[in-house]
Regions:
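Extended, low-hydrophobicity, polar/charged segments
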Residues: 1-178
Length: 178
């Protein structure tokens, strides 16, 4: 798998509108990051080499919905954790959830499978998606995620994501223990 050298600035060209917005907001908020460009990485196993290059653990970002497909959640957990729908639902106090259909992911978050990111909230003008953070992610000093593509990954301080970015977009995440 191709992984670029570490880079400390935005890409020269953007492949999606979301990717452009991600780097714009990082610049506006003065949030430092280090990033790499890669071949397409879809699964968590694809991310292992990226983790090594960035010296951190990539988060796993899951797009979930209830049975009626009327509530949507962006669940950010540790990359190595298995997802337990029952434990998630109990911790959040909601009905059982499942993975949202990919069409909803594109419609609500502006991304395809493998590119889900907390930064997708930049496209969620109607606040249709609730960000849910695993307490273990919040307690980690580093946050590794996609830049809204399957070929761009970055490392930032978790506090910059949870406090600075989410406060900037006026979204209050729910933090749960699973």
């Amino acid at each position: 798998m191709y992984i670029s050298d570490l880079q400390y600035s935005s890409p020269a060209m953007f492949t999606t509108e979301l990717q452009r917005k991600v780097y714009e907001v990082l610049e506006i908020l003065k949030i430092p990051f280090v990033r790499v460009s890669t071949d397409a990485a879809i699964s968590m196993s694809d991310c292992k080499l990226i983790d090594e290059k960035l010296d951190m653990q990539m988060v796993k970002t899951l797009f979930l919905t209830n049975a009626q497909k009327s509530r949507f959640y962006l669940f950010v957990t540790c990359g190595q954790k298995a997802f337990d729908s029952k434990a998630f639902s109990q911790a959040l106090g909601c009905s059982r959830v499942s993975f949202a259909p990919t069409g909803f992911m594109k419609e609500k978050m502006g991304v395809t499978v493998g590119a889900a990111t907390v930064f997708s909230k930049l496209l969620d003008d109607v606040d249709a998606v609730q960000v849910v953070l695993d307490k273990d992610v919040v307690s980690n000093p580093w946050y590794g995620c996609s830049d809204g593509t399957t070929t761009g990954y970055m490392k930032l301080r978790t506090l910059d994501v949870v406090e600075t970015f989410l406060n900037h977009i006026k979204h209050v995440p729910k933090v749960i223990t699973v």
